[in-house]
UniProtKB/Swiss-Prot annotation:
The keyword Lyase does not apply. CDD domains: AAK_G5K_ProB, PUA_G5K. It comes from Saccharophagus degradans (strain 2-40 / ATCC 43961 / DSM 17024). One of its GO terms (molecular function) is RNA binding. Its EC number is 2.7.2.11. ATP binds at K16, T175, D176. Residues 281-359 form the PUA domain. This is Glutamate 5-kinase. It is found in: Cytoplasm.
Length: 373
């Protein structure tokens, strides 16, 4: 079966629309364009699709209502603009969806909602219930309360996290470019459009680095989002939002935009939460033997395989596991604090008691609490 056929068969979609598409050249929301996308999403919903919308535009809408000509730099002013604009954004969507007798719901998320296991499960339950009721949830980051340190970074990332959260089949990212290219089409008339690539194709990294084609126009963030979504088995489409009838055409399997497909089997719900958790508290550097055991045998991480410890963390918190070159291999929940881990790193499990004066676990991270990335 072709990869586009998988998209055609998918029925649970997350659709992300960026602010470059939603705003009318800095003059507030482009209601005419919003009406076009709402009509397309309504068509999917009427056909039985479960649709979740991740929408930018709150800050831009707020700037217009406040009479600000330039985007502010101060965080508190951005948050004020988001607070003012969010109501306008939701009201605009609600009015458009009402034309098709479709109800909407507003969902604001922050890191704590997705890093805390109980809140993560509550958010998942709410979103699933809404979509089963035929309601289209409109998701955005809770800009009014987040700080720079705990931001998702961009709504591409948020879209991928929502895709993981609801176990979506497809993440559709609408952008102001019609697809992804192997070089900048604005500078190279011979630039080739990327039709299909694995989300984990290393060639995408090569294009993204050192000012490569994907490093411009926010495309590298879309690659990262596709990789995050792929961990739960979702395929990602990056496609031009201004293409005529773009959403139904992509859903029908038509070759539009760039498909970044998943080669992964969907992982278990708990491990999907771990993979999408964006707030690690520390990092462990592993030796080659530990990396091999994790990758090839799927075993737990023992203290003997740890060479270095970075950060401050307590028991049960999330840490990254890296190889000696600094590449992330896995992430998981630790059984020992950073102080304890520093004392037992490089030691066999049989020595934990003598090094700490007690031993609660043989494993530093149990395989049930560890996910490869």
């Amino acid at each position: 079966m072709s990869k586009r056929q998988l998209v055609k068969q998918s029925r649970r979609w997350v659709i992300k629309i960026g602010s470059a598409l939603l705003t009318n050249n800095g003059r507030g929301l482009d209601r005419e364009e919003m009406a076009v996308w709402v009509k397309q999403m309504a068509a999917l919903s009427k056909r039985g699709y479960e649709v979740v919308l991740v929408s930018s535009g709150a800050v831009a809408a707020g700037m217009t209502r406040l009479g600000w000509a330039e985007r502010p730099k101060a965080l508190h002013e951005l948050q004020a603009a988001a607070a003012v604009g969010q109501s306008s954004l939701i009201q605009a969507y609600e009015q458009e969806f009402q034309k098709y007798s479709i109800k909407t719901a507003q969902i604001l998320l922050d890191h704590d909602d997705l890093s805390n296991r109980q809140r993560y499960l509550n958010a998942r339950s709410t979103l699933r219930t809404l979509t089963k009721l035929g309601v289209i949830p409109i998701v955005n980051e809770n800009d009014t309360v987040v700080t720079d340190e705990i931001r998702f970074g961009d709504n591409d990332t948020l879209g991928a996290l929502v895709a993981n959260l609801i176990e979506a089949d497809t993440l559709c990212i609408l952008t102001d470019q019609k697809a992804m290219f192997d070089s900048d089409p604005r500078q190279n008339a011979l630039a080739k459009m990327l039709i299909e690539r694995s989300a984990f194709d290393p060639g995408l990294d090569a294009m993204a680095g050192d000012g490569g084609a994907l490093g411009r126009g926010g495309m590298i963030s879309k690659v990262r989002a596709a990789r995050l979504a792929a961990r739960s088995g979702a395929n990602t489409i990056v496609v031009g939002g201004k293409v005529f009838d773009v959403i139904p055409r992509v859903a029908s399997g038509e070759i539009l935009g760039t498909l970044l497909y998943s080669e992964s089997q969907p992982i278990a719900a708990r491990k999907r939460w771990l993979a999408g958790n964006m707030q690690p508290r520390g990092r462990l550097t592993l030796d080659d033997g530990a990396v091999k055991v994790l990758r090839e045998q799927g075993k737990s991480l023992l203290p003997v395989g740890v060479r270095a410890v970075e950060g401050y963390f307590t028991r049960g918190e999330l840490v990254l596991c890296e190889d000696t070159a600094g590449r992330e291999i896995a992430r998981g929940l630790v059984n020992y604090s950073s102080d304890e881990t520093n004392k037992i790193k490089g030691a066999s499990s049989s020595r934990i008691d003598s090094l700490l004066g007690y031993k609660d676990y043989d494993e530093l991270i149990h395989r049930d609490n560890l996910v490869l990335v």
